């Protein structure tokens, strides 16, 4: 579902986002009443805005390198800026990847003084954006940190070998999240680990497709 456009970039909302939001608000309404449900809705809107600005950071930085963005889609657990093409230089990928967490860091810095002045919700907003920025810097695909890792490795190994090594490292993080999730019975960690494994497999298939017809095989 397309909501609006920013600088010619369509902003879309996946249907699962609305379903999950409705579930969370309904649960809070039944469990804790109208006030708690309203606060949950406000938090969800703040998270929505933060993720959108994060993805716009990627998209507008990519535009500086001549790379257009087809759309930005927001999902329950994050967003995706669909670039028209991959960056051709490691430096481009590095700056595009870092732009998203940098936006979250800037939002946290803006909100922090407001929190110190006692503005309601500012502290939570700052903490949320700080957590988003740090979480996205985890060096595992498809997180921004995974792309930063590949950009750094590409300077020494080339993009093909760098992608293989970055995906191998990403698998360790994915299995780590799953192991900790099982040990602590944390559904969130299990979902993150499963999502990372899915994304790693998709990137592996994408690279294998690009290598089709060459003498090199892509396997991890």
Predicted regions located by residue number:
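Hydrophobic transmembrane alpha-helices and their immediate loop junctions
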Residues: 1-220
